[in-house]
C-alpha cells in the first residue's frame, strides 16, 4: 500500500475519502 501511495498519491487520496474515484487531473 505504501508503494502504491508513492506511485499514485492522488488515487490514494480519493480512496481514503471513502469513495473509489479515480482522480487523474
Curated annotation (Swiss-Prot):
One Gene Ontology molecular-function label: NADH-dependent peroxiredoxin activity
E.C. number: 1.11.1.26
SS bonds (residue pairs): none
Keyword Lipoprotein: no
Subcellular localization(s) per the UniProt record: Cytoplasm
Top-level taxon in the UniProt lineage: Bacteria
Entry keywords, A to Z: Antioxidant, Cytoplasm, Disulfide bond, Oxidoreductase, Peroxidase, Redox-active center
Catalyzed chemical reaction(s): a hydroperoxide + NADH + H(+) = an alcohol + NAD(+) + H2O
Enzyme type, top EC level: oxidoreductase
The UniProt record lists the keyword Cell wall biogenesis/degradation: no
GO CC terms, sorted: cytoplasm
Additional free-text comment from the UniProt record: The active site is a conserved redox-active cysteine residue, the peroxidatic cysteine (C(P)), which makes the nucleophilic attack on the peroxide substrate. The peroxide oxidizes the C(P)-SH to cysteine sulfenic acid (C(P)-SOH), which then reacts with another cysteine residue, the resolving cysteine (C(R)), to form a disulfide bridge. The disulfide is subsequently reduced by an appropriate electron donor to complete the catalytic cycle. In this typical 2-Cys peroxiredoxin, C(R) is provided by the other dimeric subunit to form an intersubunit disulfide.
Function of the protein: Thiol-specific peroxidase that catalyzes the reduction of hydrogen peroxide and organic hydroperoxides to water and alcohols, respectively. Plays a role in cell protection against oxidative stress by detoxifying peroxides.
Quaternary state and interactors: Homodimer; disulfide-linked, upon oxidation. 5 homodimers assemble to form a ring-like decamer.
Similarity comment: Belongs to the peroxiredoxin family. AhpC/Prx1 subfamily.
This protein's name: Alkyl hydroperoxide reductase C
Organism taxonomic ancestry: Bacteria, Pseudomonadati, Pseudomonadota, Betaproteobacteria, Burkholderiales
Name of the gene: ahpC
Amino acid at each position: 500500500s505504501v508503494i502504491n501511495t508513492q506511485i499514485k498519491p492522488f488515487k490514494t487520496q480519493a480512496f481514503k475519502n471513502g469513495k473509489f474515484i479515480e482522480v487523474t487531473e
